[in-house]
From Swiss-Prot:
<feature type="repeat" description="ANK 1">
    <location>
        <begin position="45"/>
        <end position="74"/>
    </location>
</feature>
<feature type="repeat" description="ANK 14">
    <location>
        <begin position="446"/>
        <end position="474"/>
    </location>
</feature>
<keyword id="KW-0677">Repeat</keyword>
<dbReference type="InterPro" id="IPR002110">
    <property type="entry name" value="Ankyrin_rpt"/>
</dbReference>
<dbReference type="Pfam" id="PF12796">
    <property type="entry name" value="Ank_2"/>
</dbReference>
<feature type="repeat" description="ANK 13">
    <location>
        <begin position="415"/>
        <end position="444"/>
    </location>
</feature>
<feature type="repeat" description="ANK 8">
    <location>
        <begin position="266"/>
        <end position="294"/>
    </location>
</feature>
<feature type="repeat" description="ANK 5">
    <location>
        <begin position="176"/>
        <end position="204"/>
    </location>
</feature>
<feature type="repeat" description="ANK 4">
    <location>
        <begin position="146"/>
        <end position="174"/>
    </location>
</feature>
<dbReference type="Pfam" id="PF13637">
    <property type="entry name" value="Ank_4"/>
</dbReference>
<keyword id="KW-0040">ANK repeat</keyword>
<feature type="repeat" description="ANK 15">
    <location>
        <begin position="476"/>
        <end position="504"/>
    </location>
</feature>
<protein>
    <recommendedName>
        <fullName>Putative ankyrin repeat protein R863</fullName>
    </recommendedName>
</protein>
<dbReference type="Pfam" id="PF00023">
    <property type="entry name" value="Ank"/>
</dbReference>
<feature type="repeat" description="ANK 2">
    <location>
        <begin position="84"/>
        <end position="114"/>
    </location>
</feature>
<feature type="repeat" description="ANK 3">
    <location>
        <begin position="115"/>
        <end position="144"/>
    </location>
</feature>
<feature type="repeat" description="ANK 11">
    <location>
        <begin position="356"/>
        <end position="384"/>
    </location>
</feature>
Length: 514
């Protein structure tokens, strides 16, 4: 093969090969043989050659470049080895864990200290010990950027990297003992133990380590920190409050056994646990004296709002008021589409019509058809507040809810045909078509529907309305003016084809160049 390449090289004179490469921009040819490679001195390469070589994993060529650099070959003076590119490639290959490429890049001039020693920091952060050691051997500063390397190696649980960096003098106590705080937060017990053996302060930042280890459920770390004197009641019993929030029952039980106050911060622990659906924690806290009814039955209300049926049932059995805060629970369960909770609350006496039938209005707004149907069956007034339910369902594009409400005699034309005007404004073509089939007036409010559909770029709606007789020139050619202002060129062109005047009114279309 080498013979054939050499023969090919000799077919044409070098100056012709140079023209071929310059014209085509194709550098592959220059990478097949040393004869061709020499032409780099003469061609005007339009791409980053080193990046190309690294991206295509052409390690043999990198080796060859290293040899040329050692020999001080004239080609090395050619600017196809830009330092900026080398530095970027060095960092990229630290991330990819390519030690072989890293070595070649450094040998041909990459600066390991570029970007505040980003290479060694990144290798430490990722736990690539062999790369960290090599970079250090080449002069990397492991303490750059406030000991970033050891901090992030600790944060990510890379014990061997941490030990190595400490052996080189890295400061584990920098930034108020960030290393042990975040190793604790992330549950890396071996790193935590090592850092404390090196005199890290576990009580830094108001006992951050034990607080965050508790919050994230790392029971082994919590126990270890407590054995060293960490204060579990710091920051108003943060540890138990947030362990409860995360549903970490084992941590919660352990903290209570050590005297954590389950009622701190107005019974935040049980409120958080209820809000997030952690039934086991809720039951345990209640057994330890937590008040499930604090703050106007907050725990029950949040459990209902967030769809945690088992918690809701349990709290109701503990005597909470299902109608607290003007029936907040059933209103928010309806708004968020939690049908089973709605049914249960109704069975317990919740008033679905509170706050002017808020429940059915918001269920309609969010498209929760089954909830809407159930509420109607329970006597909700879907016509309250000027048929707000169907207006909101139409505005938000919930066709099946719209159809159901119409079947129950909702008025689609209320409020000057609000439903079709806002369905058009928001581009809900299927709702628009259905409302038209039910007798909605597309020209209501001075052709509001086509004007707003145009303004918001809903071409399909615009075409449909125009086909039904909507006036594209209404209100001094509002439609084309605002479609232009908002950059909806497809709508603009269509409106112009239908006779819209681009020079009327404030000349928006003309200003935009149409």
């Amino acid at each position: 093969m080498t013979f054939l390449i050499d023969k090919m090289y000799n077919i044409l004179p070098p100056e012709l090969w140079i023209k071929i490469v310059d014209y085509s921009g194709e550098i592959n040819l220059l990478l097949v043989d040393t004869n061709f490679f020499e032409l780099f001195n003469l061609v005007d390469a339009k791409i980053d050659v080193i990046e190309y070589i690294v991206r295509n994993n052409l390690t043999d060529i990198l080796k060859y470049i290293v040899v040329l650099k050692t020999l001080k070959h004239p080609i090395i003076n050619k600017n196809f080895v830009p330092t900026k590119s080398l530095n970027k490639l060095l960092i990229d290959n630290c991330e990819k864990r390519r030690l072989d490429i890293i070595q070649y890049l450094i040998n041909i001039g990459a600066d390991i200290n570029s970007k505040k020693n980003r290479a060694v920091r990144l290798a430490s952060e990722r736990g690539y010990l062999e790369i960290v050691k090599y970079l250090v051997s080449q002069g990397a500063d492991v303490r750059a950027n406030k000991d970033y390397a050891v901090v992030w190696a600790s944060r990510n649980g890379h014990l061997e990297v941490v030990k190595y960096l400490v052996s080189l003098g890295a400061n584990i106590k920098v930034d108020d003992n960030f290393a042990v705080r975040w190793a604790s937060r992330n549950g890396y017990i071996d790193v935590v133990k090592y850092l404390t053996s090196q005199d890290a302060n576990i009580r830094a930042d108001n006992n951050y380590a034990v607080r965050l280890a508790s919050e994230n459920g790392h029971i082994d770390v919590v126990k270890y920190l407590v054995s060293l004197g960490a204060d579990i009641r710091a920051d108003n019993n943060y540890a138990i409050r947030h362990a409860s929030r995360g549903g970490h029952i084992e941590v919660v039980e352990y903290l209570v056994s050590l005297g954590a106050n389950v009622k701190s911060c107005n019974d935040c622990a049980v409120k958080f646990a209820s809000k997030n659906g952690h039934l086991g924690v809720v039951k345990y806290l209640a057994s330890q004296g937590a008040d499930v009814r604090s703050e106007n039955d907050y725990a029950f209300r949040m459990a209902s709002e967030n769809g945690h049926l088992e918690v809701v049932v349990y709290l109701v059995r503990q005597g909470v008021n299902v109608r607290a805060d003007n029936n907040y629970a059933v209103r928010m369960a309806s708004e968020n589409g939690y049908l089973e909770i709605v049914k249960f609350l109704v069975s317990q006496g919740a008033n679905i019509r509170s706050k002017n039938d808020y429940a059915i209005q918001k269920a309609s707004k969010n498209g929760h058809l089954e909830v809407v149907e159930h509420l109607v069956n329970q006597g909700a007034n879907f016509k309250s507040d000027y048929d707000c339910a169907i207006k909101l369902a139409s505005e938000n594009g919930h066709l099946e809810v719209v159809k159901y409400l119409v079947s129950q005699d909702a008025d689609i034309r209320v409020n000057n045909d609000y439903a079709i005007r806002w369905a058009s404004r928001n581009g809900h073509i299927e709702v628009v078509k259905y409302l038209v089939s039910q007798g909605a007036d597309i020209r209501a409010d001075n052709d509001y529907a086509v004007r707003m559909a145009s303004e918001n770029g809903h071409l399909e709606v615009v075409k449909y309305l125009v086909n039904l007789g909507a006036n594209v020139k209404a209100q001094n050619n509002y439609a084309v003016g605002w479609a232009s202002r908002n950059g909806h060129i497809g709508v603009v062109k269509y409106l112009v084809s239908q006779g819209a005047d681009v020079r009327s009114g404030n000349n928006c279309a003309a200003i935009m160049g149409f």
